Amino acid sequence: MHKLTSKLSNLILLLLIIIIFISLILTNFNNYLLENLSEYEIKINNTEISREEFIQRYNLECFYNDKNFKNDIITNPKNPKYISEIYNITLSNIIYESLLQQYVHQLHFNIDYSHVKNYIYKQTIFRQNQKFNKEKYYEYLKKLQISSNEYIKKVMTYLEIKEFIKTLTNTDFILNNEKNNILKLFEQGRIVNKSYVNLNNLKLIEHISNKELKRYYINHKHQFLSPKKFKISYFLINKNNVFVPCIKKFYFKNKDNTFQHELFLQHKKSKKQNDNIIKKLLTTHTNTSQFKNIIQKNNICIHHTPWLTQTLYKHEKLPKKLLKYIINNNILFHNNKNTIKNYPTIIHMNNNNAYVLWIQKYEKATIENFSKKIRKKIINILKNEHSKKIRYQIVQKIVYQLNHGDTNLFSQLKLKFSNSEYYSRFNTNTLTNKIFSLPIPKKGQKIYFIFHDQKKLFLYQFSNIFYFKLTKKQKKMIASYISQSHSEIILNAILENLYKTAHISYKGYIN
């Protein structure tokens, strides 16, 4: 079942995409068309989604991803993982949009035709000299391969759903009394004191038997893998870097030394030649012999990385984000992640460049032998685990004693609480969540608890509460958050119910 979390914000974005991208659509949409897409049809209750409409929506989603993420995310329209993700997003959006559209039609959110006309007239893509231009309007509809009536219907649907969302978000579903109680909770602060528990001098286990070390090694062999490592060969493809190198040697001499300097005089090929080379490379990269011939024939410069692993990847000539993407997604390997591809992989960057990469050398991950180095590593692991366990048990005992009025162990370890620290619900961290999850202590009592912070162990004392006045801006922000939260809960409930009661059938598939 599709996830429904944060559906309100996602849905509003989805609804905007429906029309905004129809208006902004460009001629290069065809670059994203799926290959090998057989007859595809989705039926949601009585709404049928044709194969053509699915492709169009897929294209819009690709366009949105490229425009929104720019160079932050590497997208490859031929990458199976990328195709799968975009396909699932498109399918989910189509289903929820159709269900909501059917629901809104049942509610009779009628939009006057004048609003539709006004909306279309205001779209900048259809305007010329600050006026609506009919020629531009029909020109863009032609690019979309959509009729004016179809476009008007889509605008009508968009405005109906937008009106429904507006009505939902503007309706106050929460009682004033409930709202005031929530505001009072936000006006409450809590006072705590902390003590750093330093038990570094604690006596640890001194001897661990060889039998215990071997048992740990056998049960945790995955911890002692020497990582798979590989060297990558690559080159960059763009229309400016395919050269014919004319190499000449230049000798420079002086009275003390003789220097030999090699000059690479690189002459660009014509645009037509470059385009032809790139086209051949992109279409023959899975044919290793043809691919190598093109590289050799055109003297394309190949670069090589040093040994790389899953955790150690650095090469000054490759963007770090690209290397991270390559390694984390195992794109140079087959699906089993241990067999390398015997042909190059092409990664399309968002700046119209492409990197062509393949693995030059590869060594599989192997389990290290039970050597002295591994024994030492296991000893440190077991000592550290034992240390943590003992320390935590001691702090638990301190907390138990303090909560029962006994300060004996606390004093023995010479622990002290710091000055008071003040927390409100506006602090956003795990410690704040912990503090506000505790009950308010009775008069004269204190509540003690343990908290880990960056491998350090702290003992906290919750002693009192205080109140402060919220500003008008803060009250407005909280009220808005409460209202949005309630609207989201209601919309999620509506969508979940619509999904559960819907008849959804699929016909066809995507390769």
Swiss-Prot record:
Subcellular location: Cell membrane
UniProt-listed InterPro entries: PPIase_PpiC (IPR000297), PpiD_chaperone (IPR052029), Trigger_fact/SurA_dom_sf (IPR027304)
Segments crossing the lipid bilayer: 9-29
Extracellular topological domain residue ranges: 30-511
Coiled-coil boundaries: none
Keywords assigned by UniProt, alphabetized: Cell membrane, Chaperone, Membrane, Transmembrane, Transmembrane helix
UniProt keyword ATP-binding present: no
Domain PpiC: 227-281
Stored Pfam families: Rotamase_2, SurA_N_3
Ranges facing Cytoplasmic side: 1-8
Gene Ontology terms: cellular component: plasma membrane
UniProt GO molecular function: peptidyl-prolyl cis-trans isomerase activity
Quaternary structure and interacting proteins, as annotated: Interacts with the Sec translocon. Binds to the lateral gate of SecY. Forms a complex with YfgM.
PANTHER family found in the cross-reference section: PEPTIDYL-PROLYL CIS-TRANS ISOMERASE D, PERIPLASMIC CHAPERONE PPID
Family under the similarity heading: Belongs to the PpiD chaperone family.
Protein name: Putative chaperone PpiD
Organism of this sequence: Buchnera aphidicola subsp. Baizongia pistaciae (strain Bp)
